[in-house]
Amino acid sequence: MGSSFGDLFRISTFGESHGGGVGVIVEGCPPRLDLDVDAIQAELDRRRPGQSHITTPRKEADQVEVLSGLLDGQTTLGTPIAMLVRNKDQRPGDYKDMAVAFRPSHADATYQVKYGVQARSGGGRASARETIGRVAAGAIAKQLLAKAAGTEVLAWVKRIHTIEANVDPQAVTLDAIESNIVRCPDASTAAQMVERIEAIGRDGDSCGGVIECVVRNPAPGLGMPVFDKLEADLAKAVMSLPATKGFEIGSGFSGTLLKGSEHNDAFVPTDDGRLQTATNNSGGIQGGISNGEPIVIRVAFKPTATIRKEQQTIDSDGKATTLAGKGRHDPCVLPRAVPMVEAMVALVLADHLLRQQGQCSLW
């Protein structure tokens, strides 16, 4: 329960941080889609640990194995696609102290309350290694969206702690995002972000921030009325990622400071009859349905829970104790969370694209 996502384009992830491996089963991918498996690996490389000095030093190649669902390793058959990444660099000994004391603001305590047992080593299913399956599946969704609708999904780090970049969602490029280790397309701001992460990490602490994501050229008409609104599904998708604490779309919370006459997106005539608005405060979605304008969302991530600083907590018997986190943990999750956000957004859009085709494209 709780490890599957989507309706028609559906994924189920499996595995623990310090188990044999992690992976995903993708169901509902249309047949005859020529997949670039190297592109799947490239997405996993963006997510993998040990890629820079501001991420966890855990060393994992995160090499994907596609076990089923492809003809000649390329063409989708329309059957379940199973992908596996084996864990190679586990260190269970790092979690000895955490086996008897709950990490503040981590899932240790709530998993124990719910299940009466927990995978203490590495956090089990609460570990960010679970997102490997999501990123692999999201890479397939990205290729489906690009081929079927010409849709592009890009995310970047907008803010680290108190340092914020002002990035134009319409102008941002993947090359600019990937030009530095923090994945902020504004080079000067990125340098400040790196310095802040370094300083906080040296102090044994951690920091959070905001990731912004744009969907360019989304198919219009995606989303369902009432409970399956597109922004509602996007919110659920990205808020299911580890460490997320907030979601906004379009003008977001700042839109509450505007009057209706200031916030409304005026429609303008077009030569081809498609919908177009003069502004995009709606973030590309109105009434829960995409209007074809760029979809712009932002996701807030809290500081990493496991830190080297000593903190007050309780042990498994409820007695007061202290805990200083050991192991290899990101001082800031945001640089590696960028492909995770892209993946979850792509999965939602792929699912809704298939639902739209199934319901509204018969005649």
Swiss-Prot record:
GO biological process, one term: chorismate biosynthetic process
Assembly behavior: Homotetramer.
Family indicated by similarity: Belongs to the chorismate synthase family.
Keyword flag Plastid: no
List of residues binding NADP(+): R47
Residues reported to bind FMN: R125, A126, S127, G287, K302, P303, T304, A305, T306, R328
Gene3D superfamilies according to UniProt: Chorismate synthase AroC
Protein name per Swiss-Prot or TrEMBL: Chorismate synthase
